[in-house]
Amino acid sequence: MKSLLINSCPWLRDYRRLIYLACLLITLPGGQTLAQVVIQETESLHSDRPEAWAMNYVTSATLLSGFGVPRSRAPGSIAVGAELDWVPQLSSTQQRVAFSGTDQVDLNKAPIFGRPRVTIGLPWRFALTLSYVPPIRIFGVKPNLFAFALERPLYERNAWAIGMRMYGQIGNVEGAITCPGDVVQFSPGSPENLYGCEKKSADKLSQHSAGLELSGAYRIERLRGLTPYIAVAGNFLDTQVGVNAQTFGILDRNRLEAETWTFSASVGATYPLTNKLMLSVGMFYSPLWVTRPPATSSQNDAFINVRALLTYQLN
């Protein structure tokens, strides 16, 4: 997240120079003080840069993928659901994404991700799903995410079903990513705080995405309606990080942005607990390519998690 600072200002490559420069800017002979320096630039990243990989990883965790195959619904029918997803914790190597993969940030925030879903039946066998995560701070992050999906069954005969859904999301997540709390407690320039974080940052990740998913399922009547499903999807991720950190007396307001096409697959099953209550559990997989130094070629560091959805049919 801090790589733009280095790329746009070559004289900052050695952090010792940065310390020296900051001292000069803060205090001059005779007590004269200069205005605080603000660095604010925008850099477009290749999709396999470590910073871009991190943005894609976090965004993939919130894609509004389906749980099962779209089914025919009566127009005006409403189903409400609660989704709960496991978010894997990253290793220190995986979190080393800033400065083109040379500095570690804090990506291990929320171990789970939850949101409500409301699905409304529309004419011509279409259905609309809406979801919103309000800006309430939890696990050290404040999300503000609105997601939606339009789906329709393509084939329904006997136990077999095939369907398609289009989905998208807009919004952002705010948190101390660049300068987390466990780093700012150390003195700027110390081994534990090499890049001079002076206080917790308030970085903001914008997550705009769109996807198209094709799914198929088979209902097993002898297992009380258990329905295994499989789905594949193509996704477009338009991500952006706005850095908001203070390091060595300099305000970092740089912006990193990336556009990436990804593929994802899901496999799972739905099970009717009652005639109105449905439980769905699935595994989500999306390969994500990244080039980490000193490597010069990209490798797959995929996002994999388990997701669950409990749905109640109101009418």
Language model: regions and residue ranges:
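Extracellular/periplasm-exposed beta-strand and loop segments of Gram-negative cell-envelope proteins
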Residues: 91-96, 102-109, 137-141, 170-208, ...
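Outer-membrane beta-barrel "beta-signal"
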Residues: 301-315
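Cleavable N-terminal export/targeting peptides
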Residues: 1-53
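Residue-level signature of outer-membrane beta-barrel architecture
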Residues: 120-122, 152-154, 170, 216-220, ...
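Repeated loop/turn-to-beta-strand initiation elements of outer-membrane beta-barrel proteins
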Residues: 125-130, 157-162, 223-226, 273-281, ...
